[in-house]
Amino acid sequence: ADAEQYNGAQDALVKGRYDTGFAALDALATAAADDANVAALQTFYANATADAAAVAEHGARLRGLSPTLADAVDRAIAVIDEAATETIDFAPNTDGPRTAIVVLGLGLDGDGNMTPELVARLRSAVAAAERSPESPIIVTGGNPQSGITEADAMQRWLVEEGIAADRIHSESTANSTVQNAQRTTALAAEIGIENMVLATTPSHLRRAISDFEIAGSDVIGAATTNVDDVPDLPALAPTARLGMTVDATKILGIPRTY
């Protein structure tokens, strides 16, 4: 496919400029009919615009080009649609050391200090850790400020709050939710984790669950400081899932640019 045209299509789609993006993809599909990435993008973004007929059309063409990628796209779309609408369990049944409590990082200030929002995530993780005392905690986040990564700051805070240092596992290189999901999934596999509970800002939960599930994790619920007063998380309409869709294309390895 023509690189300039492909890159232009991607730039439009990630910003939600669908008419421009779809027109560019349609032209690419004609000029480079064997490019499975183009068909995958058409399928993903047709789903993001709730165009079921186009999802079926582009999905069928993708399957003819790459059954493996088609399977991955179909699974990712199913995950997106479920994560966008499911009732999130804030008091999941954990499985001791096989369930990890995962805290997603958030940008530090210039001196390496945590924001109140990140501290709130950590407080919910501590509450979950008290309810599941055998579960390890994974902190994930890079983005260093003054030589301190998000994971460093979170680990230090947890230890100061009385969490045993050997209970905490650190992933200190991720710079996005996509990387949080990919790198934490890999770390969890290394330490024998079978499922996880996510600790993040409520408004970020649906996207985070989608990313982690697409990356291969089994997310069984979310952390909260009070299981009797959980956040109200309305479902996301089909056309409100752009961020989840963009993330899914990255996790599947569909190039952002050619």
What residues fall within each predicted segment?
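Low-complexity, Gly/Ser/Thr/Pro-rich intrinsically disordered linker/tail segments
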Residues: 238, 242-258
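A structural signal for short, hydrophobic/glycine-enriched beta-strand patches
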Residues: 2-36, 41-50, 58-240
